[in-house]
Amino acid sequence: MHLKIGTLTIRTIMLFTLCTFLTLFAFSTCFDETKTINLESQEIYDDLFESKEDLQNERNGNSDEYRYMGSNSINDINRYNRLSMQPENEFLQERSLKPAANLPLRFGRTSDDKIAKSIPSFDKIAKSIPNLPQRFGRYLSGKTKVQSMANLPQRFGRAQYTNHFVHSLDTLPLRFGRTPHSDRLQYEMNSHPLELKNPEEDSDRKKRQAMTFRIRTDLQM
């Protein structure tokens, strides 16, 4: 009897706990569902019962504030567009022309008539051009060419164009087949006689003398 009573009490306790757990679980789920439904319904009701005055007072594209801001921005843009670019263009043009005249004449750059017209002191610049180094195919026309080439060393096959600078060739180094002056050549030949060792050297000496005499006559012409 005591055992039966003990088993019954245990069963009743277990059933009671299960029932309480199920009831709590069902209550919590139902509460969550009702809460979500209430929120959705509240939003729907707010949309339905929204006042018409709020809709009319909303900002639109024709409001006074928007028109005021738009007019100010358009006026600012027009004001900046009306500014003239003439001073800046003149500055850039002068900046592009003046350094071209101050730089050495290189890479085949020539003095153009446009630069002469745009720069008032172009004559002074043209006079200073012969003092610049002759590099990369720079060429000078007319008198400046003759005057500047007489002061330059004779290198890389530079030819003797006129008799204007023949006298200055004595001071230049003897390079690339340049021949000395006739008086100097005669003096060197008389003051430094060659010592002959064999007839072949004698013939070579005579050939060299004949060549120098021929070149000397060409220079004097």
From Swiss-Prot:
Keyword Secreted among UniProt keywords: yes
Expressing tissues: Observed in the suprachiasmatic nucleus and in several telencephalic and diencephalic regions.
Keyword Chloroplast annotated: no
Removed propeptide positions: 26-95, 110-127, 179-221
Gene Ontology terms describing biological process: hormone secretion; negative regulation of gonadotropin secretion; neuropeptide signaling pathway
GO molecular function: signaling receptor binding
Signal peptide start and end residues: 1-25
Pfam family, one: FARP
Residues recorded with modification Phenylalanine amide: F107, F136, F156, F176
Keywords: Amidation, Cleavage on pair of basic residues, Neuropeptide, Secreted, Signal
Subcellular location: Secreted
InterPro entries (UniProt xref): FMRFamid-related_peptide-like, FMRFamide-related/fGRP
Protein function: Primary role is to release GH from the pituitary. May act as an endogenous ligand in the bullfrog hypothalamo-hypophysial system.
Family: Belongs to the FARP (FMRFamide related peptide) family.
Identification of the protein by name: Growth hormone-releasing peptides
The organism of origin for this protein: Aquarana catesbeiana
High-level lineage: Eukaryota, Metazoa, Chordata, Craniata, Vertebrata
